[in-house]
């Protein structure tokens, strides 16, 4: 389908499935990864169709390598517009709208948690990045292609990162919509080996630091709810479990923390989404 942007009038493509049910059904909004667009293969699509749930996979300015991409105002607006389109064109239970993504899609999922105009029931963000300033340094050191993408996203010149634009496109520097937590939840999942050579490009510190930021912003007083520096260093050094936690999809959970509908899970894995678990947990 084609969806017109309310900001600049450009047409955004999306894959869209609408339920055949006469009863309103949930809407799954699945967000593509960093280097891809709406046409990317998406297992959430198949699982949604099998359950006959409404589903949309928007383009939101395509791969993250242009000034319009990377969680810009246009990106937020495009994803919101895709939700409007689904509501207008399918039998959507608007009390059950879910947003999910991994990697760059996890980044976009967190951006939507922070800034979407819609009332979303649950956000599920897998192996996200949240800080373009830090990620630029991390990818540049490892000579990964993402460093050049970040320069392109931030209107940087002469290979010098435009830090002002990078900050504006990094959810860790945004204001937390505290009131949203009265009706929505955010799950952040990260494979504990992500960020290590051969296991993925996004260090686990992105998820940990964002989780801690949210707890600071909501005024969480219980220090055990935060990920402490000691816990963070233990995970980075040993990559071992910090207690006895449940497993997910047969994977050991190394750390689980929660506060006020915000949950953080670090599991035995790398830069990945555990597809069947992620879908079932989303719609539960």
Features from the language model and the residues they span:
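Primarily recognizes the serine-hydrolase "nucleophile elbow" in alpha/beta-hydrolase
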Residues: 36, 87-89, 94-143
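Short substrate-entry loop that stabilizes the transition state in hydrolases
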Residues: 23-25, 30-68, 196
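C-terminal catalytic histidine-bearing segment of alpha/beta-hydrolase fold enzymes
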Residues: 189, 195-198, 205-284
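N-terminal cap/lid segment of alpha/beta-hydrolase-fold proteins
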Residues: 1-22
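Structural recognition of the beta-strand scaffold that forms the well-ordered cores
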Residues: 27-31, 54-59, 98-100, 122-127, ...
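Alpha/beta-hydrolase active-site loop
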Residues: 70-90
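Mobile cap/lid helix-loop segments that gate and shape the active-site cleft of serine hydrolases
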Residues: 40, 121-122, 128-129, 133-180, ...
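Short, proline-enriched alpha-helix->beta-strand connector loops that line the catalytic pocket
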Residues: 169, 179-186, 258-262
